[in-house]
Amino acid sequence: MIVIPAIDLFDNCAVRLFKGNYEEKKIYSSEPWKLAESFAKNGATLLHLVDLNGARNQLGVNEDSILKIRETTSLKVQLGGGIRDKEKLAYYDKIGINRFILGTAAVTNPDLLKYALDNYGKERVVVAVDARDGIVKIAGWEKDSGIHYRDLLERLVKAGIEHIVFTDIAQDGTLAGPNLEAYREILNSYPFQVIASGGIASLKDLMDLSSLKTKISLYGVITGKALYEGKLDLAKAISSI
């Protein structure tokens, strides 16, 4: 299991939301590329980068920051938020983004999902499954899809998806701990390489996730707020897992 630091971009700043609420966001840095550099120095190999403006269909707002992060860090970057057409995929491929995260498009545009798989390969396509009370949320977590996450996971198996990020939105940004039961269920029921996201507050949370007794082990875990609030030491976390 790998530890994956996160940067969520809103208006070119690194922010964290509370339970996905844009009205409850906290700004941590106006120079997010410096955060990425510090993550690399502390031993991270992969960065989870989210364009929150893009997720709400406010396209292009964070492009300068995304490009600067890509140009200044040695980290591999997986990027999501607003990837809803072939042109955006092609642009991010051109600037060197390593993995593309599709959330809304994976629910509403299966043709684009197939296109991404066919043209960029299964290792570079990740689907974000973001759920609140079991129902998948889309469009920056602001709209209900009407689909239970289990039904979406079944679709993704049939589509040939291998990598997912699963977020329990009710835990995200709360530092209240991860939803262990949800991850236990998914890892025992589906063949995905799963990245856990939401609620991580301590090294104990990471250890609890890494020690789940499941058919498939977690591929990775995303942490953001715990790093920014000083509750989790990235270098120690990486060396401990």
From Swiss-Prot:
Supply the alphabetized keyword list: Amino-acid biosynthesis, Cytoplasm, Histidine biosynthesis, Isomerase
* One Gene Ontology term from the biological process aspect of the record: L-tryptophan biosynthetic process
Give a Gene Ontology cellular component term annotated to this protein.
cytoplasm
Task: Report the subcellular localization.
Answer: Cytoplasm
Q: Name one Pfam family in it.
A: His_biosynth
* Top-level enzyme category: isomerase
Record pathway: Amino-acid biosynthesis; L-histidine biosynthesis; L-histidine from 5-phospho-alpha-D-ribose 1-diphosphate: step 4/9
Documented EC number(s)? 5.3.1.16
Active site residues of this protein: 8, 130
Asked if the keyword DNA damage belongs to this entry, the reply reads no
UniProt catalytic activity = 1-(5-phospho-beta-D-ribosyl)-5-[(5-phospho-beta-D-ribosylamino)methylideneamino]imidazole-4-carboxamide = 5-[(5-phospho-1-deoxy-D-ribulos-1-ylimino)methylamino]-1-(5-phospho-beta-D-ribosyl)imidazole-4-carboxamide
Q: Which GO terms describe its molecular function?
A: 1-(5-phosphoribosyl)-5-[(5-phosphoribosylamino)methylideneamino]imidazole-4-carboxamide isomerase activity
In the record, the note on similarity to other proteins reads: Belongs to the HisA/HisF family.
Name assigned to this protein? 1-(5-phosphoribosyl)-5-[(5-phosphoribosylamino)methylideneamino] imidazole-4-carboxamide isomerase
Q: From which organism does this entry originate? A: Leptospira interrogans serogroup Icterohaemorrhagiae serovar copenhageni (strain Fiocruz L1-130)
